[in-house]
């Protein structure tokens, strides 16, 4: 009986890394269930939150069970120390912050810690698989399935007229049946390089160009959301893919069989990118940028008029024909997040030393309405303070520096479409997190970043 139990546990342990990878496919399904919970059942605690936090606990349990594996003790020690720092910040805020919501504080901590716990869990799981090629094949396949579910459901929602708009105002865009448009565009942006990688891997001749269909579907769905993030990620990814495909073609063109594959994919990538650039003026993003500037100019004129009536001096910005002013450019790039950032800087300036060190918690020292800056690194800094923020950055800096050194020291070997697209996923994730948020503080998004980071760490033998 005891032997049977041990065998069963070993089997479960062997299957768990596969389950961790398979969980990628369930992400869009959880997001659809979240929408159903909110819009139909009117629940605040959604299925997505409950399942994802349960999954995080499973990943943590898996890490603890494999504490003897190389690096595991280091990860566990870090999580314990980080947990203590977060607990100090939470207790401090419960004592001195008013108003304060215990539930929102804990939820934000859990959401922020989610990618770090999962990162350690995935590193251990991928090491247990002991087959990087198998892991890579599974990852790009599961990313493809998740993207197809997202793309097809958005297109189906739009076709049936049952979709939700991305914006509450006059801007154009559709988020399909999904709840959060910003999260959705971040997911597409982070997954897009992996879908392009899948298309490239499968397209070995012109007769197999149909493998680029998932890429085109993902492009269409992402563009129809109407955000800058989705469009920017597509252009950057296709640009990187085209550049490195051409370089690989030039390198392998004399090798039998290999050169032709790179030529086919270079031509297809060029056509897809060229087609997008030609159609850009007709896309929601182009129309939204124009609408955004009109709204911005109207708000500015109202404010200027108000200031004049109050006797304030209104500074006129230099405005050359066809050029944007600095404030217009900032408004377009940050979607006015920089204004909330000023509010947070004031909160932080007025905060006591304990909050400067251990953070002001969720939404800072707000008075009535809870609102994040929606720029991940800023939100994390203000929420966790100097000590907590540095602790949070530690694994990202540690692994980031190691990956960068490995890429530089093995440049010829790693100078490939595969590694450059994987690296672009990480850069896009952190860039989007910095500029428009909804990556590190959104469990629905951060899992995709974490899986690719964990794969690169194991594949490049960094840990």
Question: Across the structure, where does each feature detected by a protein language model lie?
Answer:
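Hydrophobic, aromatic-rich transmembrane alpha-helices
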Residues: 2-10, 17-22, 55-68, 191-201, ...
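Loop-to-helix entry and N-terminal half of a specific, functionally important transmembrane alpha helix
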Residues: 20-24, 401-435
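Alpha-helical transmembrane segments of multi-pass inner-membrane proteins
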Residues: 137-164, 181-250
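A membrane-periplasm/extracellular boundary helix in multi-pass inner-membrane enzymes
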Residues: 245-323, 348-350
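Aromatic-anchored transmembrane helix interface
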Residues: 48-54, 79-87, 99-127
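N-terminal signal-anchor transmembrane segment
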Residues: 2-66, 87-95
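Long extracytoplasmic/lumenal interhelical loops at the membrane interface
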Residues: 164, 175, 179, 324-387, ...
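Interfacial loop-to-transmembrane-helix boundary motif in multi-pass membrane proteins
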Residues: 74-82, 122-155
């Amino acid at each position: 009986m005891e032997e049977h139990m041990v065998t069963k546990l070993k089997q479960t342990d062997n299957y768990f890394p596969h389950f961790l990878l398979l969980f990628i496919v369930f992400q869009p399904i959880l997001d659809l269930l979240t929408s159903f919970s909110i819009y139909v059942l009117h629940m605040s605690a959604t299925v997505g939150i409950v399942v994802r936090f349960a999954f995080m606990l499973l990943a943590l349990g898996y890490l603890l069970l494999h504490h003897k594996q190389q690096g595991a003790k280091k990860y566990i020690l870090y999580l314990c120390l980080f947990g203590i720092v977060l607990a100090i910040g939470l207790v401090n805020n419960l004592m001195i912050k008013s108003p304060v919501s215990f539930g929102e504080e804990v939820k934000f901590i859990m959401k922020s810690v989610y990618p770090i716990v999962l990162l350690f869990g995935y590193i251990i799981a991928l090491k247990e698989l002991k087959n990087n090629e198998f892991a890579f094949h599974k990852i790009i396949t599961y990313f493809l399935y998740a993207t197809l579910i997202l793309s097809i459901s958005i297109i189906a929602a739009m076709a049936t007229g049952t979709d939700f708009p991305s914006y509450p105002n006059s801007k154009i865009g559709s988020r399909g049946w999904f709840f959060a448009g910003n999260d959705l565009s971040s997911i597409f942006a982070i997954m897009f390089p992996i879908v392009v990688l899948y298309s490239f891997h499968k397209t070995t001749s012109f007769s197999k160009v149909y493998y680029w269909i998932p890429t085109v579907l993902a492009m269409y769905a992402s563009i129809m959301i109407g955000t800058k993030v989705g469009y920017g990620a597509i252009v950057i990814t296709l640009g990187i893919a085209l550049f490195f495909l051409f370089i690989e073609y030039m390198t392998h063109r004399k090798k039998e069989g290999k050169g032709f594959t790179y030529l086919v994919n270079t031509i297809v990538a060029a056509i897809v990118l060229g087609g997008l650039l030609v159609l850009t003026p007709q896309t929601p993003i182009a129309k939204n940028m124009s609408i955004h500037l009109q709204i911005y100019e109207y708000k500015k004129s109202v404010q200027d008029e108000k200031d004049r009536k109050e006797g304030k001096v209104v500074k006129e910005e230099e405005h050359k024909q066809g050029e944007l002013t600095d404030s217009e450019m900032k408004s377009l790039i940050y979607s006015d997040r920089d204004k909330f950032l000023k509010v947070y800087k004031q909160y932080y300036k007025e905060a006591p030393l304990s909050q400067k060190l251990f953070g002001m918690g969720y939404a800072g020292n707000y008075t009535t309405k809870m609102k994040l800056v929606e720029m991940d690194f800023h939100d994390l800094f203000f929420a966790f303070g100097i000590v907590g923020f540095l602790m949070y950055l530690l694994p990202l800096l540690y692994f980031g520096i190691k990956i960068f050194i490995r890429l530089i020291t093995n440049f010829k070997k790693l100078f490939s479409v595969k590694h450059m697209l994987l690296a672009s996923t990480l850069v896009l994730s952190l860039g989007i997190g910095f500029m428009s948020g909804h990556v590190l503080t959104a469990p629905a998004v951060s899992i995709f970043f974490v899986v690719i980071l964990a794969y690169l760490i194991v594949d490049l033998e960094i840990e």
